[in-house]
Curated annotation (Swiss-Prot):
NCBIfam families: proS_fam_I (TIGR00408). Catalyzes the attachment of proline to tRNA(Pro) in a two-step reaction: proline is first activated by ATP to form Pro-AMP and then transferred to the acceptor end of tRNA(Pro). Its EC number is 6.1.1.15. Consists of three domains: the N-terminal catalytic domain, the anticodon-binding domain and the C-terminal extension. GO terms for cellular component: aminoacyl-tRNA synthetase multienzyme complex; cytoplasm. Belongs to the class-II aminoacyl-tRNA synthetase family. ProS type 3 subfamily. Keywords: Aminoacyl-tRNA synthetase, ATP-binding, Cytoplasm, Ligase, Nucleotide-binding, Protein biosynthesis. Its main location: cytoplasm. The gene is proS. One of its GO terms (molecular function) is ATP binding. Pfam families: HGTP_anticodon, ProRS-C_1, tRNA-synt_2b. It comes from Borrelia garinii subsp. bavariensis (strain ATCC BAA-2496 / DSM 23469 / PBi) (Borreliella bavariensis). Homodimer. This is Proline--tRNA ligase. It catalyses: tRNA(Pro) + L-proline + ATP = L-prolyl-tRNA(Pro) + AMP + diphosphate.
Amino acid sequence: MSDFIASKEDDYSKWYLDIVQKAKLADYSPVKGCMVIMPYGYSIWSKIQSILDKKFKETGHENAYFPMLIPYGFLEKEKDHIEGFSPEFAIIKDAGGESLAEPLVLRPTSETIIWNMYSKWIKSYRDLPLKINQWANVVRWEKRTRPFLRTTEFLWQEGHTAHATEEEAVEETLLILDLYKRFMEDYLAIPVFCGKKSEKEKFAGAVSTYSIEALMQDKKALQAATSHYLGLNFAKAFDVKFQDKDGKMRHVFASSWGISTRLIGALIMVHSDEKGLILPPRIAPIEIIVIPIFKKEDEINKKILDYSDCVVHALKKAEFRVEIDKDVRSSPGFRFSSAEFKGIPIRIEVGINDVLLNSVTIMRRDKDRKFKYQISLDSLASKVKVELDSMQKDLFKKALNFRTLNTKEIFRIGKDSYELFKAYMNDHSGFVLSCWCGGLDCENIIKNETKATIRCIPDDFKAKDLTGMACIYCASRAKYFVLFAKSY
């Protein structure tokens, strides 16, 4: 199987695309920039959905669905919002054989349509907070696309909340940011930096944007999630007011936040290898694959298959997500490689010797193929749990070690510091922690000269002392520690 996949070191982009297609995660559609998410890829998205949906409901959010067709006039109501998204609009001007009185935009994001509805639903302080989540599709007319990472249409969730006070809205924004961080690290086994975006990089229409930033194996950063504090911007644009306890009319404060199918791309790029996909157990649709190793004799094969069914039954009874591969036409080696390519965490082999010894042979996806051992059926469930937990931790630890090795600190300590910074960014990739004055000119020049952007003002380094620190470009007094990186 790995003979048909590009080398990660020689052609990272093709390696990624090979995994997407040959693991049957997605395929190209007839529409440029759009993808078909295949059943196995969609099962990963379904797993992401089920975990996050439960967490959203635990924090008081409800699901709803809003139209994907948005009147163009709605988007014009928030100036910054339309300026930020208008280049990516897909606009419908004709329908039903007639020209529309007002063009409709295919949903690029839902703030405007949702806040139009909130103006009808919110009248009193008793209506607040209003916390709604939507699972939907989005259309943004991207010029350069890549499956899962950047597509014209993609799936996502978007949360939209309304609050009586600024404090509540900011608290909600940061609560969701932390929820995303824990999800990324605890379930996807991807270490992330969290922090505030610069004014240049923030969401169009937000007061402030916070992001989750991860490092891929090609040492480029990927923005995995965002959470926005919207202030009063959309409430004023759509005249959303409530009567407070004193009878005064006030505008409501807002947040919005989201993640998308881009996370599947992140999973591939953080964990996978040249044998194919590697999935952390907690997010894998299939945790265990049981592969009977058939012989030529039908009588022996029946014993192997009956025993394999018993193994599957025992694992399902212990509430593992398990499947069996009963393909008699393909060789064991091909079936092993197929399971590896799909990234299934645990492979259990069942041969006639296992039947006779009341045992099975276990193999872990993230270990070398030599790492396999026999274990009795009686202790299988407990041992599998240990291996799955260990694999989850090991994948996170490996990704964290990789990020640590590829996060460098470069501060201004002399007149040549920026040239050293620029040379490093042009010759290497990864995160670079440095200092910034907060100036847009410096940010733009650094981006133009290095292709690196400010990914965020990271929370991890808030405790660091800025006394005596200077902007890496202009040498004026630094206001922030920032993370620079080239990114997707």
